[in-house]
UniProtKB/Swiss-Prot annotation:
<dbReference type="InterPro" id="IPR004606">
    <property type="entry name" value="Mop_domain"/>
</dbReference>
<dbReference type="GO" id="GO:0005886">
    <property type="term" value="C:plasma membrane"/>
</dbReference>
<keyword id="KW-1278">Translocase</keyword>
<comment type="similarity">
    <text>Belongs to the ABC transporter superfamily. Molybdate importer (TC 3.A.1.8) family.</text>
</comment>
<dbReference type="Pfam" id="PF00005">
    <property type="entry name" value="ABC_tran"/>
</dbReference>
<feature type="binding site">
    <location>
        <begin position="32"/>
        <end position="39"/>
    </location>
    <ligand>
        <name>ATP</name>
    </ligand>
</feature>
<keyword id="KW-0813">Transport</keyword>
<dbReference type="InterPro" id="IPR005116">
    <property type="entry name" value="Transp-assoc_OB_typ1"/>
</dbReference>
<feature type="domain" description="Mop">
    <location>
        <begin position="290"/>
        <end position="352"/>
    </location>
</feature>
<keyword id="KW-0067">ATP-binding</keyword>
<keyword id="KW-0472">Membrane</keyword>
<dbReference type="GO" id="GO:0015412">
    <property type="term" value="F:ABC-type molybdate transporter activity"/>
</dbReference>
<dbReference type="InterPro" id="IPR008995">
    <property type="entry name" value="Mo/tungstate-bd_C_term_dom"/>
</dbReference>
<dbReference type="InterPro" id="IPR003593">
    <property type="entry name" value="AAA+_ATPase"/>
</dbReference>
<dbReference type="InterPro" id="IPR050334">
    <property type="entry name" value="Molybdenum_import_ModC"/>
</dbReference>
<dbReference type="InterPro" id="IPR003439">
    <property type="entry name" value="ABC_transporter-like_ATP-bd"/>
</dbReference>
<keyword id="KW-0500">Molybdenum</keyword>
Length: 352
């Protein structure tokens, strides 16, 4: 299963030119600054707008092919769409909204989706009585119950306040693990990208600047505008190794070494995404005998980037890499050089 996109579309002064093959599972984040063509890209997939030229294929079906005069209507594409606003029917109950558009009602599947989204207690209520987060959960349920081959989500959290965003993010994380269809997710929020996206399409002025896993793209110069000024960081996906319930800590496997974080929910082997900022990493040439820092990992220097009165140091920890920011004074005193074995003292780890 996959989505193949090869289209051009003029949108006022912007020309959207996209050529992509998106995997048939997981969440692909569509990311970029405002006006880069994010929403237009998924509207082309949905059929709400048509390309000037090109084609889009979903699995073995051609959705549109301008050269061969093929154009399936939106309702023929078997694609679910969740908009920024829930767009529920006010005169239908929650159950009525959920059932709208179902071709063949399946009670078992209905119950599964309702439980997954935590909306069992809302079925008899009407949209006017729901919070913004509840409305969006109902909208997501309605889209899923149409049994789509793909789900499109256009900034579904943008109209919500922070508590509701956090609430719905937790449901979206759960959703991504439970359903077996690809999701295209438009956002301009780094937090949503970190929490949800397996892959990222970075759009810049209508063109695909990059398409890769979030972990790889985060290291790219293309993502520097979104990183904290003057600070480098590494985004890693690591499996849970074990838990220490006495100290309320969880060990993640980083190469062949352990990285301790605050206690997490999850079985051994579950993958967790983390971020390590360069300002939270210091360097020592020997293992400290007594220290409060729990994460001291051995590695090798692979890059030295002088910058003003500091040096950014990239350290390889097996196949993974992190950054440390040290003063020029410290770098000279330690005589840091590429290929040198060092110990990275990691003072803080952010779990996404």
């Amino acid at each position: 299963m996959m989505l193949e996109i090869n289209v051009k579309k003029r949108l006022g002064q912007l020309v959207l030119n996209a050529r992509l093959t998106i995997p048939g599972q997981g969440i692909t984040g569509i990311f970029g600054i405002s006006g880069s063509g994010k929403s237009s890209l998924i509207n082309l997939v949905s059929g709400l707008i048509h390309p000037d030229e090109g084609n889009i294929r979903l699995n073995d079906r051609t959705l549109i092919d301008t050269a061969n005069n093929i154009c399936l209507a939106p309702n023929q594409r078997n694609i679910g769409y969740v908009f920024q606003d829930a767009r529920l029917f006010p005169h239908y109950s929650v159950k009525g909204n959920l059932c709208y558009g179902i071709k063949r009602f399946n009670q078992q599947e209905f119950n599964r989706i309702v439980r997954l989204l935590g909306i069992e207690h809302l079925l008899a209520r009407y949209p006017l009585t729901l919070s913004g987060g509840e409305k969006q959960r109902v909208a997501i349920g309605r889209a899923l119950l149409s049994n789509p081959e793909m789900l499109l989500m256009d900034e579904p959290l943008s109209a919500l306040d922070l508590p509701r965003k956090r609430e719905l993010l937790a449901y979206l994380e759960k959703l991504s693990q439970e359903i077996n269809i690809p999701i295209l997710y438009v956002t301009h929020s780094l937090d949503e990208l970190f929490r949800l996206a397996d892959f990222v399409v970075l759009l810049d002025e209508g063109k695909v600047a990059a398409f890769d896993s979030l972990e790889n793209l985060w290291q790219s110069p293309l993502f520097e505008p979104w990183q904290e000024q003057g600070q480098k960081s590494a985004v890693l996906s690591l499996p849970i190794l074990n838990h220490n319930f006495s100290y309320k800590m969880t060990a993640l496997l980083l190469g062949e070494q352990q990285l301790w974080v605050k206690l997490l929910n999850g079985d051994e082997g579950k993958t967790v995404r983390i971020c390590i900022r360069s300002t939270d990493v210091s360097i020592t040439l020997t293992v400290p005998e007594k220290t409060s820092i729990r994460n001291i990992l051995s590695g090798k220097i692979i890059t030295l980037l002088p910058k003003g009165n500091q040096v950014d140091v990239k350290i390889a920890l097996g196949k993974d890499e992190i950054w440390a920011s040290v003063s020029t004074w410290a770098a000279e005193e330690l005589q840091l050089q590429i290929g040198q074995s060092v110990y990275a003292q990691i003072k803080a780890v952010s779990v996404m």
